[in-house]
Amino acid sequence: MNIKIAGAISTGLIIVLAVVLVMPPFLSYQFTPQHVLLLFTIDSKKDTSSWCTQLSQVLEKHDATAAIFLSGSTAEQHPDCITSFSDEIDIGSQGYTGNSIPLIPDYSDQLEEVKKGKQVIDEIGNFDSKLFKSPYGDTDQNIYSLLEKSGILADFSYDTQYNKFHNGQFIWFTIESYDANSFSIDDIPTKSSERINPIIINFENNIAIDEIDDLLSDVKKQRVTFVSASDLVGFELNSMEGL
């Protein structure tokens, strides 16, 4: 075989091999899934228990994880809003009454509000719930002290960040939050370079189950990965250890 031809063939094989080796990570980068957390805030209504049961079925249908938040009082009235969901769904508290915590004037009463809400959730769910979302998103300078003293390690009270307890303090991580009523699939970035922060879609239990079902069907078409709150913070938020 002509030396020049052999050399050209060898060079071509090397180039092809290099392309084969480089393409998988390149394609992986190009098609990075967008992380999406479905966050449901549940208030006490006449049909709340039925709504929760139907929601659990929709989440299972779409193989979707999520985070559910409710007050201790709502949980007592509608325990199905805890027991209906699989272990893949994180359950968090919103105090006991569901009222704005900063409006409680005394610190010890604020602490009792947070602790009692968590206690009810824990007893019904038979787990140690470590996540919290302040009612109405209302917080003040006491929030992290209250959470730490209550054994809560993750906070989803804000629209632009979530906070987790690490090395003796709460640290924040950026998120992008959307109201389910106004959310559009156009809000999901199409480029991997833009898929930097997790997206949280906020639902309340005044949204029809059929609408949630339809929205999840549309979202799944956009190369997303549904994540739980535990996935985001990197540790289990509904632990059964020690119970």
Q: Where does each model-flagged region fall?
A:
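Solvent-exposed loop and beta-edge segments used for protein-protein assembly and interaction
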Residues: 32, 60, 193-195
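A general structural signal for short secondary-structure junctions and capping/turn motifs
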Residues: 2, 163-164, 190-192
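A generic secondary-structure signal
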Residues: 58, 120-124, 190-191, 218
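Metal-dependent polysaccharide deacetylase catalytic core of the NodB/CE4 family, i.e.
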Residues: 37, 62-145, 149, 153, ...
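Catalytic-core regions built around general acid/base machinery
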Residues: 54-62, 78-88, 211-222
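Solvent-exposed, polar/charged alpha-helical surfaces in well-ordered, non-transmembrane soluble domains
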Residues: 53, 57, 112-115, 119, ...
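Catalytic grooves of carbohydrate-active enzymes
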Residues: 37-46, 51, 173-232
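N-terminal pre-catalytic segment of deacetylase/amide-hydrolase enzymes
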Residues: 1-40, 48-50, 224-243
